[in-house]
């Protein structure tokens, strides 16, 4: 099974937040990927906290999470998910993660409880870390 990490899951791990143990276990034992859109989200949050952007790439390599470039197929699917996720306020980054999970037939991993309200509608299995 492949796991697709949302920015919230990676941030929880990197910052020792609740749910970090769940993410750590997945990364140690399973194949994990992350959309380049979600990498940008994580990087933005970490830069806001003073981390150098170059450190993000090193950290992802150390975590053994494979980055996946956001391509036209993902972008099109991401846009199509807008209608079924708008009512719970999912962002572009959220939908990018869900789109990638749908395409790779993986499980999306997040700390955002709103995702459980749309998982069935977008045909993606969602694992809540908290």
Please report, for each region that a protein language model flagged, where it lies by residue.
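Short active-site oxyanion
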Residues: 1, 29-32, 64-66, 102-107
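Short, well-structured N-terminal submotif of metal-dependent ribonuclease cores
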Residues: 1-34, 46-58
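Alpha-helix capping/helix-boundary segments
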Residues: 9-10, 38, 74, 96-97, ...
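Conserved SAM-binding loop
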Residues: 12, 67, 90, 108
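A general structural signal for well-ordered alpha-helical segments in protein cores
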Residues: 20, 39, 53, 75-78
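Acidic catalytic patch
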Residues: 64-86
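Acidic, PIN/NYN-like endoribonuclease modules and their adjacent C-terminal/linker elements
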Residues: 98, 102-130
